[in-house]
């Protein structure tokens, strides 16, 4: 079983913010595929997809970003998901708007959601799909990430949504992650 974690913050006031790109991606992928909503007491919206016997859970943690690791740990323990079968979708201020970067593993890069997942899982060995949201040096970081984006930025950030959905599909289908990194990191 695979686990795809879209990072974000719960609540309407965070809907169209840069920090909620993980939620947006999960919603986009689900809108194009048949899925089942699972009812569980885990502080997350949990969806299950089955492609050619490749079972996958997609989750949107409903804790705040900084506590995402709590939910991820509960899910992987309950479903016995291996660390190498986890893909976390996350915003990245160090990438230009809409730029994509796949990583096999790594640190948190200052991202508190990733930091909490690393702390709770006691490993950095999970895969990531980073989506660039850029950085505004004139605005405090928390305000920048948690303020709704304008239409132009939204379009830039999501310009590769079809490619993102293809990456997720390939991850679910067990395409070698090195091949995905080589194919997408240099082009998008």
From Swiss-Prot:
SUPFAM superfamilies in the cross-refs: Peptidyl-tRNA hydrolase-like (SSF53178)
Molecular function as annotated in GO:
peptidyl-tRNA hydrolase activity; tRNA binding
Kindly list the residues the record flags as site (Stabilizes the basic form of H active site to accept a proton): 91
Q: Which GO terms describe its biological process?
A: protein quality control for misfolded or incompletely synthesized proteins; rescue of stalled ribosome
Q: Which GO terms describe its cellular component?
A: cytoplasm
Pinpoint the site Discriminates between blocked and unblocked aminoacyl-tRNA: 9
Positions of tRNA binding: 14, 64, 66, 112
Grouped into one coarse class, the protein's main location is cytoplasm
- Which Gene3D superfamilies does this chain map to? Peptidyl-tRNA hydrolase (3.40.50.1470)
User: Where, subcellularly, is it found?
Assistant: Cytoplasm
UniProt enzyme class: hydrolase
Q: Which reaction does it catalyse?
A: an N-acyl-L-alpha-aminoacyl-tRNA + H2O = an N-acyl-L-amino acid + a tRNA + H(+)
Q: What does this protein do?
A: Hydrolyzes ribosome-free peptidyl-tRNAs (with 1 or more amino acids incorporated), which drop off the ribosome during protein synthesis, or as a result of ribosome stalling. Catalyzes the release of premature peptidyl moieties from peptidyl-tRNA molecules trapped in stalled 50S ribosomal subunits, and thus maintains levels of free tRNAs and 50S ribosomes.
PANTHER family attached here?
PEPTIDYL-TRNA HYDROLASE (PTHR17224:SF1)
**Assembly with partners or alone:** Monomer.
Q: Which family does it belong to?
A: Belongs to the PTH family.
List the protein's name: Peptidyl-tRNA hydrolase
Q: Which organism is it from?
A: Aster yellows witches'-broom phytoplasma (strain AYWB)
Lineage of the species this protein comes from: Bacteria, Bacillati, Mycoplasmatota, Mollicutes, Acholeplasmatales
Gene symbol here is: pth
């Amino acid at each position: 079983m695979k686990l795809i974690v879209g990072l974000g913050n719960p609540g309407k006031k965070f809907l169209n913010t840069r920090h909620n790109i993980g939620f947006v991606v999960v919603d986009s992928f689900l809108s194009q595929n048949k899925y089942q909503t699972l009812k569980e007491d885990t502080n997350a919206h949990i969806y299950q997809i089955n492609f050619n016997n490749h079972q996958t859970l997609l989750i949107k943690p409903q804790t705040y970003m900084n506590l995402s690791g709590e939910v991820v740990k509960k899910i992987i323990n309950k479903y016995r998901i291996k660390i190498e079968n986890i893909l976390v979708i996350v915003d990245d201020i160090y990438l230009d708007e809409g730029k994509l970067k796949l990583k096999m593993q790594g640190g948190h890069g200052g991202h508190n959601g990733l930091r909490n997942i690393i702390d709770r899982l006691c490993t950095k060995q999970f895969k990531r799909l980073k989506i660039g949201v850029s950085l505004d040096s004139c605005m405090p970081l928390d305000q920048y990430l948690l303020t709704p984006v304008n239409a132009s930025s939204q379009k830039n950030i999501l310009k590769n949504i079809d490619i993102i959905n293809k990456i997720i599909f390939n991850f679910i289908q067990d395409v070698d992650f090195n091949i995905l990194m080589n194919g997408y990191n240099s082009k998008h």
